[in-house]
């Protein structure tokens, strides 16, 4: 029996509607299955979530000594938390970092900091660099003795005698690229980088000349890091300046 034209059109529309509904349900089912498969294949762990960090900072946060991105593995958790917080609050400026942490809670920043603080991959050998003897000597002086005439305390006075940092919030400065060190000390000197007040690093950086900054960075970048080097215990050093980023010990 042949359908009249209006009835045929209605039948076609009903068939088309049913087909589209069936197709949509099928596609939804496939998408759900794919999502379940992806969820099963990628475990929801802190390590997996932090691939956004290790993409730049390297596996476990180890970085390298010949790139711009710093090593964050093994740094004191308090220091790492302070830096993440500073990026979120605008005291440090780097668009990619700000984008990553802009909407993260304090608790999650602390979780990230704790994860990387607990990573201890080996350090690479120092990067090749050949400063002049005068530059090397000036860097050695500033790191280990400071410059009383310019009211510059020795780096070891805050960062520890082995320059491996002090718990809970002072970082070690060895194993970092020279260019990174120059850029960060320079950022404090020109006001682009800030820490919690009183900002002791800003005070020190203001007293350093460009040549001083280059000398310190060259000396630090040339030092090997001993296996098992870690930040020393709280209270191991008496700070020569008040630092808002370092909690006072009772």
Model-derived regions, located:
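Bacterial N-terminal signal peptides
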Residues: 18-29
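Extended intrinsically disordered, low-complexity coil regions enriched in Ser, Thr, Gly, Ala
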Residues: 76-98, 175-186, 190-199
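N-terminal secretory signal peptides that target proteins for export/translocation
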Residues: 1-14
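Short, recurring structural edge motifs at helix starts
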Residues: 66-70, 98-101, 168-170
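Short, conserved sequence motifs enriched in acidic/basic residues, glycine, and aromatics
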Residues: 71-74, 103, 172-175, 207
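Flexible coil segments in periplasmic/lumen-exposed cytochrome c-class electron-transfer proteins
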Residues: 37-50, 59, 92-164, 190-250
């Amino acid at each position: 029996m042949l359908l009249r034209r209006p009835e045929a059109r209605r039948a076609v529309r009903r068939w088309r509607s049913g087909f589209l509904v069936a197709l949509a349900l099928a596609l939804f089912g496939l998408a759900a299955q794919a999502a379940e498969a992806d969820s099963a294949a990628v475990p929801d762990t802190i390590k997996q979530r932090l691939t956004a960090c290790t993409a730049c900072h390297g596996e476990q946060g180890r970085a390298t000594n010949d790139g711009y991105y710093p090593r964050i593995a093994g740094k004191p958790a308090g220091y790492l938390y302070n830096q993440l917080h500073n990026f979120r609050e605008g005291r440090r400026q780097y668009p990619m970092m700000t984008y990553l942490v802009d909407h993260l809670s304090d608790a999650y920043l602390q979780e990230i900091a704790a994860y990387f603080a607990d990573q201890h991959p080996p350090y690479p050998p120092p990067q090749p660099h050949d400063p002049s003897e005068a530059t090397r000597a000036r860097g050695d002086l500033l790191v280990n003795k400071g410059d009383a005439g310019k009211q510059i305390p020795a780096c070891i006075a805050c960062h520890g005698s082995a320059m491996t940092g002090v718990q809970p919030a002072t970082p070690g400065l060895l194993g970092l690229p020279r260019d990174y060190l120059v850029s960060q000390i320079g950022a404090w000197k020109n006001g682009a980088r800030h820490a919690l007040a009183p900002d002791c690093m800003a005070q020190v950086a203001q007293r350093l000349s460009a040549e001083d900054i280059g000398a310190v960075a060259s000396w630090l970048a040339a030092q090997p890091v001993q296996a098992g080097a870690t930040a020393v215990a709280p209270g191991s050093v008496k700070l020569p300046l008040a630092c808002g980023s370092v909690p006072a010990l009772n």
